[in-house]
Amino acid sequence: MLQKLGFLPGFNKQVTSTGAESQWIDGENVRFRYGTPEKIGGWNQLGESKLTGAARGLHHFVNKASTKFAAIGTNKILYVYSGGVYYDVHPLTNPSGTAITSAFSTTNGSPTVTLTFGSAHNFQPQDIILFGDATTFSAITNSNFVAADFADKKFMVTSVPSTTTITITMPSNETGSGATTSGGITYFQYYHVGPAEQLGAFGWGISLWGGNILGALTTTLNGLLGDNTNGNNGSATEITLGSTTGFPSSGTNFIQVGTEEISYTGITASKLTGITRAVRGSTRAAHSNGATVTNTSSFTGWGSPAANTDQVTDPGLWSLDNLGTTLIALIHNGECFKWDGDATNATSTRAIIIPGAPTASRDMLVSTPDRHLVFFGTETTIGNKTTQDDMFIRFSSQENIEDYTPTAENTAGTQRLAAGSRIMGAKLGRNAIYIWSDTSLFTMRFVGQPFTFAFEQAGTNCGLIGMNAAVEVDGAAYWMSDNGFFRYTGKLESMDCLVEDFVYDDLNTTSNQLIYCGINNLFGEITWFYPTSTSNVNTRAVTYSYLDSTAKRPIWFTNASALFPRSTWEDSSVFGLPHATKYNPSDDVSFDVTGNTEGVTIYFEHETGVNQQEAATRNYVRT
């Protein structure tokens, strides 16, 4: 006789497979609805282009003409997507452009172009430089490169040999005899965002592999280095560089050439003195004349643990929100910008810096309906980045995002939180703003003058694991902490999770800032995308069904499919369906940035049927 078998919804990975009687223990590309498993919804790529860099922020909003916009912030470029087209609206450090003359140097047979500036620049390796139109270009002698090779094109900075030079890489080699400081053009510099990945405190890992940090200065060797203990140019104890400007000169310092680390104890003109080859666990090797030399004095040695856990490089993150039809965009630990969605030909304009706003903050949001712009982990003295306090909060005056000085006539103000070492993130809720430090939860409520906002600590030992690891749904906040999943509905609750060990036992906690939480209100789901212990990008997802879960049976399920993990997610409130991004670090494409080696991002629309990109997905559940 046939007998109907009943299985509880969700996965239970907290028990052995034999102990999970009448329960599902694993699956891929499935969800649970009405108590039964079904295929997750499909997805299709939006637009024909791929985006440069790793997407780390996504926000939807609408202008007064009902035009829908998606702001997508990658670690390279801030985009606005609308009508199937991506628009580069990234802010420029020099919006009017800067002309340089005697600028280009090339070598026959090489794609490398060296740009020389009339004064010190502040470019870092892998920053983006945009050249002006052809009218700003003057010819380069002894070169086959012409105006069309540069005009209105973006390039990624390949290296920074000195404080007055950078190199870029052309898509083809120089066929002329080679130019020396010839020609000129107008250039525009993109604001620096940060590395694509978050890396731990190991010398090689946190210097240039994941992106430039701490303003790492580069130059070149002036003379080859042999595979021996000597310096170059016949010296046993000195290495001659193209320039030593900016390199530290007191105490023991370090450079990296190729994969070899070298220490030095002094500087004389363009020479490093008192050198020792192959230090900090690196291997000695030969290096050619002109090889890139990087100042690694601020970094921990090869394979050596950092002196403290704060030596972890945050990835290039964005905080995105809107004040009405104006996009507000904050670079994590950097400046804040605005972009007017109602401007004439808005998609042809760029985001601009907000005058008077802090210039270094960890997070940002717009408080509604009172319309204050709030900065978290920000400066105690506006405009002085050295005063950034990771627990300090500053908010603008009501309806004026350029006024932050508290007076008797405005509602601007400040507050410092006490519990924790740094603010990790904040979310706007129905009844309050939720603020998480690395240890605690706080609420921030608008109360009007004279205090404007009231702050209250709502929980301890429940800090936020990463800036984007929390959401708010129907008056309840949900988040992922270092020690489990939590919910706040007026009281703090530790959530029972039947896949908790599976998630936390294989979680890359060094890359905690990559964790991204999103809502799918079409199915009542909250999903956290996270990196496993062997990955520096998000590779898995864990989902909580907030609509169908009960106190006795919380519904959780995971997805380890290589197709599904996302770097950002935004719900369906504006476009009608959820949107998300996937970062592919192994994809190297030029797009419109020559020399991009950091992979690309694809932008998807979800819940479009049951297939991905018109191809079937692998779906199963296992008992």
Model-predicted regions and their roles:
Residues 90-236, 242-316, 344-348, 352:
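Small/polar beta-strand repeat architecture
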Residues 75, 83, 256-258, 332, ...:
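Short strand-coil-strand connectors
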Residues 191-196, 324-348:
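Hydrophobic or amphipathic alpha-helical targeting/insertion segments
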Residues 42-62, 90-95, 300-313, 345-515, ...:
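Beta-propeller and closely related beta-pinwheel folds
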Residues 1-96, 195-199, 317-319, 461-476, ...:
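Beta-sheet repeat architectures centered on beta-propellers
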Residues 63, 83, 134, 267, ...:
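Inter-blade boundary loops/turns of WD-repeat beta-propellers
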Residues 121-133, 373-376, 525-528, 617-623:
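Beta-rich globular "head" domains
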Residues 66-69, 325, 431:
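Structural hallmark of WD40 beta-propellers
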